[in-house]
Structures are given as structure tokens and as C-alpha cells.
Amino acid sequence: MKKSNLKIFILAGGLGTRLKSIISDVPKPMAPILNKPFISYVINNIREYYQDEIYLLTHHKSNIIEEYFKSDSKIIIIKENNPLDTGGAVRNAILELNLSVETKILVINGDTYIKPDLNQFIASSDGQINIITKKISDCSRYNTLSIRENRIEKFNDKKESSRNMHVNLGYYLFNDLYFFKDIIDDKFSLED
């Protein structure tokens, strides 16, 4: 994977409201799976392709994530003071790192595990913004995407979703940062 201008951000700041009754003492990305935090599996998958720094964008119970990864010099924590949603968290990290608009970023949901071929995804992603999706038959539990000719036309709420639609698998590649250049809202979602 060509790394010269690539940064990897993992979204790890959510409240985990649906899992609160099961794992109230840790943030959702730190949910234990076979005695390891879930997010460590995501990071290990990335490290098969990428050896540079990985930025964890945190908020809720950030101290637990910071403590776990404190001895890993390649994990950098960027903490939101207030919850900023997915897009706001990314924008906050871009500003904090003072990234140029030519920088390429891969944003990954810290609570989603898939094993894509990241080299192939990056090499084949020619749009400004690229998202890994999957077409599924039962979309009742998911927000979906309306796609035509490999272009996203719309993000759909669960209420608008029907059968056999694409769902977002939580991997976003921004080939440059022009998308974020003129956004002035601190808090916004990547899916809006």
C-alpha cells in the first residue's frame, strides 16, 4: 500500500447505547472478544497492509482506550472534547493534524469488522469519496445506500430501506480532503 500521503483514522468515540446493558464499563470498540478488545482485531487487520501510525478518534470513555494502547507508539489518540459524530470527528482530526487537502485518508468504523483487501480498495477507488458496501437481501436493521452506476445517490434511513439494497460496511476512502474544506459545522455525520 502506498503510504506517502495516506492517514488512517478509526472512529472510536461513540456512546455504544445499544450495548450499554452488556458492556457498560468500556466503550464499544473495547468490547472484549476472546480476551482482546474488538478494536484490536480491526487494527491487526489494518497492520497486514499498513505499518505507519493509526489514529483513533475517541470521545466516550477515551481514557480506557488511551490506557490500553499507551505502549503502542504507532497508535495516536485524538480525543474529541464534545461528541462530534462521524464527520465532525474526522474534521476535528484533520484540523488537529493540520493535514493538507492533498492528503488521502481511510476512515474505518471502530465497531465494524470486515477483512477487505485494502490495497485493492485503495487502488480501485477513483472517486473523491469511496465507500465499501455490500448488497444484502434483508435491510430492515440497516440504513442503506441508493447506488446507480457505482455512484451513491442517497443515504437512506432504515424506514426508507427496502430489500436487496447496499449497506455501508464502515470503510471510507477520501482521495483528498476537499470534501471537508468548506464545512463549518463542528458536528455532522459522514452519512448525511
List where the protein language model places each region:
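Conserved N-terminal catalytic core of the sugar/cofactor nucleotidyltransferase
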Residues: 1-10, 18, 32, 36-109, ...
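Active-site glycine-centered loops adjacent to acidic/histidine catalytic or metal-binding residues
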Residues: 14, 111, 135
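Short alpha-helical oligomerization interface
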Residues: 24-29
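Short, well-ordered beta-strand micro-motif
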Residues: 32, 146, 173-175
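Short beta-strand-to-loop element that shapes/binds the nucleotide-sugar donor at the catalytic cleft/hinge
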Residues: 60, 130-148
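Short, charged, surface-exposed secondary-structure boundary motifs
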Residues: 86-89, 138-143, 163-166
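Catalytic-core segments of class I nucleotidyltransferases/pyrophosphorylases
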Residues: 106, 113, 119-123, 137, ...
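Conserved donor NDP-sugar-binding/catalytic core segment of glycosyltransferases
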Residues: 124-129
